[in-house]
């Protein structure tokens, strides 16, 4: 797999996980993830780039496992009414799933799986990731960040993104439009997902 693609995948998932852990505001140390993200950002294009990325990804894996374990404990306590449901966002299960998906992708990258591009596409457009990117929160900043993250991905696929930019601008101007915009946006993304999956299954995406 191309090292630039590995770098993009790493930064994409790290950005989401770091942002979500910050919002959750629980006792999970994200300093190491931020540090590893910076290391990835600072990797220059030289003959050792693949080796460096591989080493960093091996260091990310135990952190993800630790995140998953801690988050699952909190989720189970919420389910068993041992923690107030108001203390943590209801989408904590989605954050667990994102950690698991990223973990699965990293394991495939490290083992040099030749089909990683296709499988990564399918994983990325899975319901869990899609839900996380479309989730409506009370805060505008994380909403805006998630929309921009998705737009950047679509832009990399040479897809017309004007309509997505228009939706972000509407979100900025009028928070009351969120639910209606989200429904319209969801339909557009769903169509795009189906289109991408067709390409994947026809082996037209490399």
Segment roles from a protein language model:
Residues 30-35, 89, 93, 148-152, ...:
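Short, charged, amphipathic alpha-helical segments
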Residues 164-206:
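C-terminal accessory extensions/subdomains outside the catalytic/core fold
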Residues 60-90, 95, 99:
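Hydrophobic, ordered structural segments
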Residues 11-15, 65, 124-126, 186, ...:
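An acidic, Gly/Ser/Thr/Pro-rich helix-cap/linker signature
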Residues 15-23, 38, 42-45, 69-76, ...:
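Generic structural signal for well-ordered, non-membrane alpha-helices
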Residues 84-158, 203:
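Charged, well-structured binding/catalytic surfaces in domain cores that contact anionic ligands
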Residues 21-29, 47-54, 71-85, 106-113, ...:
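Secondary-structure edge/capping motif, primarily at the C-terminal ends of alpha-helices
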Residues 1-66, 196, 200-201:
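Leu/Val/Ala/Ile-rich N-terminal alpha-helices, chiefly Sec-type signal peptides and the beginnings
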């Amino acid at each position: 797999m191309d090292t630039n693609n590995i770098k993009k995948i790493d930064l994409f998932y790290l950005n989401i996980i770091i942002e979500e852990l910050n919002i959750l505001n629980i006792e999970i140390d994200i300093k190491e993830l931020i540090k590893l993200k910076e290391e990835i950002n600072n990797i220059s294009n030289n003959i050792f780039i693949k080796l460096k990325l591989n080493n960093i990804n091996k260091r990310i894996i135990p952190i993800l496992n630790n995140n998953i374990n801690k988050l699952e404990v909190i989720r189970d306590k919420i389910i068993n009414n041992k923690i107030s449901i108001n203390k943590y966002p209801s989408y904590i299960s989605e954050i667990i799933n994102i950690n698991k998906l990223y973990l699965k992708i990293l394991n495939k990258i490290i083992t040099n799986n030749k089909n990683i591009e296709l499988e990564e596409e399918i994983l990325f457009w899975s319901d869990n990731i899609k839900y996380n990117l479309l989730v409506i929160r009370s805060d505008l900043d994380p909403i805006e960040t998630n929309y921009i993250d998705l737009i950047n991905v679509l832009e990399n696929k040479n897809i017309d993104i004007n309509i997505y930019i228009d939706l972000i601008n509407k979100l900025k101007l009028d928070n009351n439009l969120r639910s209606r915009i989200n429904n319209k946006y969801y339909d557009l993304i769903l169509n795009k997902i189906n289109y991408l999956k067709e390409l994947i299954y026809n082996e037209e995406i490399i």
